């Protein structure tokens, strides 16, 4: 298990709707804990495969 993630390595992450991009620290998971980051957003992806509209993610601006 990734110490930065509540899920088992390779499994889907689960995160509350209030999750912020900066809290997305999963490195061993295939899916993101956060849905506010677009794919390829290096600032908040931090190893996660983030998805969503970039206009919903102020840390990517």
UniProtKB/Swiss-Prot annotation:
One GO CC term on file: nucleus
Biological-process GO terms, alphabetical: cellular response to cadmium ion; cellular response to copper ion; cellular response to zinc ion; detoxification of copper ion; intracellular zinc ion homeostasis; negative regulation of growth
Gene3D superfamilies on file: Metallothionein Isoform II
GO molecular function: zinc ion binding
Binding site for a divalent metal cation 5: 34, 36-37, 50
Annotated a divalent metal cation 1 binding sites: 5, 7, 21, 24
Binding site for a divalent metal cation 6: 37, 41, 44, 60
Sorted UniProt keywords: Acetylation, Cadmium, Metal-binding, Metal-thiolate cluster, Zinc
Transmembrane segments annotated in the record for this chain: none
Positions that bind a divalent metal cation 4: 33-34, 44, 48
A family per Pfam: Metallothio
Region listing for Alpha, in residue ranges: 30-61
Positions of the UniProt region annotated as Antigenic epitope: 20-25
Binding site for a divalent metal cation 2: 7, 13, 15, 26
Positions carrying N-acetylmethionine: 1
Residue ranges, annotated region (Beta): 1-29
Binding site for a divalent metal cation 7: 50, 57, 59-60
Binding of a divalent metal cation 3, residues: 15, 19, 24, 29
Record has Acetylation as a keyword: yes
Family: Belongs to the metallothionein superfamily. Type 1 family.
Domain notes: Class I metallothioneins contain 2 metal-binding domains: four divalent ions are chelated within cluster A of the alpha domain and are coordinated via cysteinyl thiolate bridges to 11 cysteine ligands. Cluster B, the corresponding region within the beta domain, can ligate three divalent ions to 9 cysteines.
Remarks, miscellaneous: This metallothionein binds zinc.
Function of the molecule: Metallothioneins have a high content of cysteine residues that bind various heavy metals; these proteins are transcriptionally regulated by both heavy metals and glucocorticoids.
Record's protein name: Metallothionein-2
Lineage: Eukaryota, Metazoa, Chordata, Craniata, Vertebrata
